[in-house]
């Protein structure tokens, strides 16, 4: 199986307690903005790029809120999913990746939970704890 890293941005509007979600055309579902890490990208570079492509927003990636893993047999992928806390620092909602994203919506945490059953304890529990992420640079031996 090929290893694939995928990143997601949990963009929270704290005043409204809503999460920004994107509607995926291919699977006709909703998810947090995100996608596969490209060669040569760090996880944070990837989550910033994916959020910009899918929402038009510039984000700052925070700590990791969740790490999930799956064997996607139909694609022959061993996928690791990294969910980052994210904060909007600029831009306006404008989908750039119109081939894969149909719409965006601010959803209540409870509504967003329905689209993400793989976070078994729910999104609220993710917001209670985090793991710092640090890119250590390039090691040359």
Per-region residue spans from a language model:
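Nudix hydrolase/Nudix homology domain
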Residues: 28-30, 99-141
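Conserved Nudix-box catalytic region and its N-terminal flanking loop in Nudix hydrolases
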Residues: 17-53, 141
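Short, charged/polar surface micro-motifs in flexible loops or helix N-caps
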Residues: 15-17, 27-28, 38, 67-70, ...
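A short coil-to-beta-strand element that immediately follows conserved catalytic motifs
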Residues: 58-66
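Conserved N-terminal beta-strand and adjoining loop/helix that marks the start
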Residues: 1-19, 36, 85
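Active-site-adjacent beta-strand/loop module that shapes the phosphate/pyrophosphate-binding cleft
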Residues: 70-93, 105, 126-127
């Amino acid at each position: 199986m090929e290893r694939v890293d995928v990143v997601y941005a949990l963009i929270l509007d704290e005043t409204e307690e809503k999460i920004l979600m994107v509607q995926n055309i291919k699977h006709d579902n909703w998810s947090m903005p995100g996608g596969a890490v490209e060669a040569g990208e760090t996880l944070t570079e990837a989550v910033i790029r994916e959020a910009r492509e899918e929402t038009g927003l510039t984000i700052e990636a925070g700590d990791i809120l969740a790490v999930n893993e799956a064997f996607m047999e139909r694609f022959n992928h061993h996928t690791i999913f990294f969910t980052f806390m994210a904060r909007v620092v600029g831009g306006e909602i404008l989908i750039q990746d119109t081939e894969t994203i149909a719409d965006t919506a601010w959803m209540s945490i409870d509504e967003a939970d329905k689209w993400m059953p793989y976070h078994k304890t729910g999104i609220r529990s993710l917001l209670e704890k985090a793991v710092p992420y640090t890119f250590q640079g390039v090691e040359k031996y």
